[in-house]
Regions:
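Short loop-to-alpha-helix "cap/lid" segments that border enzyme active sites
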Residues: 2-150
Length: 150
């Protein structure tokens, strides 16, 4: 067992209502607490209200916003830990990378399969990169690490 392994729990926005999404978030947190897994779970959602509710009922929870329409400064102000945005958001708004680092906001991106884009995110020291090509990304990460330590 790797104590550093984390579980990512995505709570989808409700198509029925915002209230339903918030209710699902509450029930999800209760379930994770009952499983004594709270310390190893990160929550992600495209619904900002869902994440705000999670932080309200579980202040220690690690949450990351997926939608891509809030700045790192706004995420920090809301008491959230990170942003997990589609890779194109960061290509369009590269200033958000610096802002996230300044604010201490976790940088996470998805889904990066293009080798040149992998290089860009690695060079910008993202905390997490979601990819369908993990072998290639690991190879690039090792090469970059080797270059930096020569």
């Amino acid at each position: 067992n790797n104590p550093n392994t984390r579980l990512v729990c995505e709570i989808k926005p409700s198509e029925i209502s915002k209230a339903r999404g918030v209710s699902v978030a509450e029930e999800t947190v209760k379930l994770i607490r009952s499983l004594k897994a709270a310390a190893m779970v990160d929550y992600i959602s495209f619904d900002f209200e869902i994440l705000k509710k999670i932080k309200e009922i579980e202040p220690e929870a690690q949450v990351q916003f997926l939608n891509g329409n809030k700045s790192p400064k706004a995420i920090k102000k809301a008491g959230m830990e990170g942003i997990d945005y589609n890779h194109m958001v960061f290509k369009i708004l590269p200033k958000w990378v610096k802002q996230a680092k300044k604010e201490g906001v976790i940088l996470n991106t998805w889904t990066v399969n293009d080798p040149e884009m992998m290089d860009w995110f690695l060079k910008n020291e993202f905390d997490f990169i979601t990819t369908d090509e993990p072998e290639l990304l690991l190879q690039k990460q090792k090469s970059l690490w080797t270059e930096g330590n020569s």
